[in-house]
Amino acid sequence: MKLLSLHVQDFRNLAAVALAPSPRATVLLGENGQGKTNLLEAIYFLTTLKPLRAVRLAELVRFGADQGAVAGDFEGPGGVRRVAVQVAAGGRTATLDGKALGSGARLDDYFEGLASVCFSPDDLLLVKAGPDGRRRFLDRAAFNRWPAVLGEAREYVRALRARNAALRAGPAEVEASFREPLVRAGARLLVRRRELVAELAPRLQAAFAEISGPEAPEAHLAYRAAGGVDVAHPEAEVAARLAHALEARLERDREKGFTSAGPHMDDLVLALGGKGARLYGSQGQQRALVLALKIAEIENLRAALGRPPLLLLDDVSSELDPAKNRFLLGYLAALPAQAFLTSTDRRLIEPAAGPDTAFFEVRSGVVSPLVS
């Protein structure tokens, strides 16, 4: 699916933007703080209904405005569709071809064909940072793979909050009543994540070997569940094992007022040659591993959907060494995907630019076309 046109109104620092992107590569150039990332976030928000950066929704609205809006025309096998989302302090409202979700349009229909993968400098810290970032990566990748994950994750968060409240204030029978919904929703997420990791692992190995060469250690990817929950089973068995872990930790959880086992406590383990990359990998190896992980996600979606996702790359070239940047740009040039890239330096992108690459300047929230 291709983004034919993008309209942004009062989103972050973008007052009014009308963009006709290239079907292949659209490059946004400008100094830091001018709005390049905000434009990528507008596209990401349109295709996922979630902010790219964790904030309150009200912070997405331009200062002084009552609400922000993003709309796009997407061309796919079924023709052209218009998706739009308005955001204000009270929440967001999404529409598909003018019909609001829930009253004429379904969430599944909205997300059909809208998979997007974002790659930012923060992602390069994925290996060495804490598990929160790796869980966010897993959930975003799982959502792209199975859009129903969005609702499943929300169900789990609601159940988790309810059980935590019961642990802190409720009697035993109240906690027990909230445990079953948590187990059901948690097992569903655990199985989704397990299946995703199984799909990504061989693609990660192949991409890392291609990036780093034949002498590099073999890359591995594994899912580590908290509380000793073994997720290598059918969903019903995973649910039983999660329930057992929660029962075994009940007194400890009561003391802390917090659920200590479940998807919200798990981690994604990246290793090189059998050793944890977080502790034993060099910075260069860690960055190559993250690059390989992103390529694995793209290739996995390409295989599942029959087409590559929409790509959003936020100033990544400036954070990679020349060899890895050449590899990334070469990969993008060969991929039949629509990509949006930001940079402060045109020279980092230009070697891979094709005749259909479109360049734009972003300055103080204003987006203007540049002559090639």
UniProtKB/Swiss-Prot annotation:
Could you tell me the keywords of this UniProt record? ATP-binding, Cytoplasm, DNA damage, DNA repair, DNA replication, DNA-binding, Nucleotide-binding, SOS response
Q: Which domain of life is it from?
A: Bacteria
Q: Name one GO cellular component term.
A: cytoplasm
The family database entries (InterPro entries) matched by this protein are listed as: DNA-binding_RecF, DNA-binding_RecF_CS, P-loop_NTPase, RecF/RecN/SMC_N, RecF_2
- Note one Pfam family from the annotation: SMC_N
One GO MF annotation is: ATP binding
Binding locations of ATP: 30-37
Gene Ontology process terms (BP): DNA replication; DNA synthesis involved in DNA repair; double-strand break repair; SOS response
The record's subcellular location field reads: Cytoplasm
**Would you identify the family this protein belongs to, as annotated?**
Belongs to the RecF family.
PANTHER family listed in its UniProt record: DNA REPLICATION AND REPAIR PROTEIN RECF (PTHR32182:SF0)
- The protein's role, per its UniProt record: The RecF protein is involved in DNA metabolism; it is required for DNA replication and normal SOS inducibility. RecF binds preferentially to single-stranded, linear DNA. It also seems to bind ATP.
Protein's name according to its UniProt entry? DNA replication and repair protein RecF
**Taxonomic source organism:** Anaeromyxobacter sp. (strain K)
Q: Which gene encodes it?
A: recF
